[in-house]
Amino acid sequence: MLATEARQILSRVGSLVARNQMRAISNGTAQLEQQAQPKEAQEPQIKKFEIYRWNPDNAGEKPYMQTYEVDLRECGPMVLDALIKIKNEMDPTLTFRRSCREGICGSCAMNIGGTNTLACISKIDINTSKSLKVYPLPHMYVVRDLVPDMNNFYEQYRNIQPWLQRKNEAGEKKGKAQYLQSVEDRSKLDGLYECILCACCSTSCPSYWWNAEKYLGPAVLMQAYRWIIDSRDENSAERLNKLKDPFSVYRCHTIMNCTRTCPKGLNPGRAIAEIKKLLSGLASKPAPKLETAALHK
């Protein structure tokens, strides 16, 4: 009796599975047929892009927004794909930076839909009823169109001396032997070294907008902390001394726009807080877990 009922249940389950498989095959076939249709037979997906334009060579011309229409069927999924398509097929005068197309180099940083991010990893909103506005990074001088002037930003980065500094470099085998670092000390650099210097965080910070000449900004300060906390670096005290003025660090008011907008998911606000703790004496740099110059003897 039980065996008979079990066979009936298994039979019904088998029939149900078979029907579901047939539906899946049917749906898959329909999708393939739709994809196989020529693009002319498919309904266009026209997306409007409103892009900031300004050419300094045109004397007296003010910045303006120019609208382009892109068929999303013939374009890659990212905003950078659309910009490249516009430049290649519609308007070769459109100017922007780009390089790796993988979120690694930081070249294509811009303000997209009100958020500072990287065009190469920012997906296009497929809602064609809304246009997408694209601006250069805010509160920076503009070279042309979507290209900001990064000179001040890079000069600030240069001023923190972003390289490993040792007190006895002359007596060490520089370039011939590694400086040792424990796993624990190395882990302190996680969330710091990944910064690609795209400036999305700094240009989203109101304090940086108001004090760009004196306040170093989230990106540069996070890199400063990366070298201050590195167990192999022996110049941390001097690095901190350079940050003791009222502006370099203390213009940060923990607004935290920097952390919200970082396309790499980093936390510049936390790094700045750690620098403040070191400057105030609430914390100190711990001694290295390993003798860093052991291989140089």
From Swiss-Prot:
EC class (word): oxidoreductase
Binding, [4Fe-4S] cluster: C195, C198, C201, C262
Catalytic activity: a quinone + succinate = fumarate + a quinol
Binding site for a ubiquinone: W210
Pathway stated in the Swiss-Prot or TrEMBL entry: Carbohydrate metabolism; tricarboxylic acid cycle; fumarate from succinate (eukaryal route): step 1/1
Ligand binding ([3Fe-4S] cluster): C205, C252, C258
EC annotation from Swiss-Prot or TrEMBL: 1.3.5.1
Swiss-Prot/TrEMBL keywords: 2Fe-2S, 3Fe-4S, 4Fe-4S, Electron transport, Iron, Iron-sulfur, Membrane, Metal-binding, Mitochondrion, Mitochondrion inner membrane, Oxidoreductase, Transit peptide, Transport, Tricarboxylic acid cycle
GO MF annotation list: 2 iron, 2 sulfur cluster binding; 3 iron, 4 sulfur cluster binding; 4 iron, 4 sulfur cluster binding; electron transfer activity; metal ion binding; succinate dehydrogenase (quinone) activity; ubiquinone binding
Stretches assigned to the 2Fe-2S ferredoxin-type domain: 47-140
Domain 4Fe-4S ferredoxin-type: 185-215
UniProt-listed GO biological process terms: aerobic respiration; mitochondrial electron transport, succinate to ubiquinone; respiratory electron transport chain; tricarboxylic acid cycle
Transmembrane helix listed as a keyword: no
Tissue expression profile of the protein: Most abundant in the adult thorax and low in abdominal tissues.
Listed cofactors: [2Fe-2S] cluster; [3Fe-4S] cluster; [4Fe-4S] cluster
Major site of localization recorded for this protein: mitochondrion
Localization: Mitochondrion inner membrane
Membrane topology, record value: Peripheral membrane protein
Cellular component annotations (GO), alphabetically ordered: mitochondrial inner membrane; mitochondrial membrane; respiratory chain complex II (succinate dehydrogenase)
UniProt remark on cofactor binding: Binds 1 [2Fe-2S] cluster. Binds 1 [3Fe-4S] cluster.
Binding site for [2Fe-2S] cluster: C100, C105, C108, C120
PANTHER family xrefs: SUCCINATE DEHYDROGENASE [UBIQUINONE] IRON-SULFUR SUBUNIT, MITOCHONDRIAL, SUCCINATE DEHYDROGENASE IRON-SULFUR PROTEIN
Family: Belongs to the succinate dehydrogenase/fumarate reductase iron-sulfur protein family.
Protein task: Iron-sulfur protein (IP) subunit of succinate dehydrogenase (SDH) that is involved in complex II of the mitochondrial electron transport chain and is responsible for transferring electrons from succinate to ubiquinone (coenzyme Q).
Subunit note: Component of complex II composed of four subunits: a flavoprotein (FP), an iron-sulfur protein (IP), and a cytochrome b composed of a large and a small subunit.
Protein name: Succinate dehydrogenase [ubiquinone] iron-sulfur subunit, mitochondrial
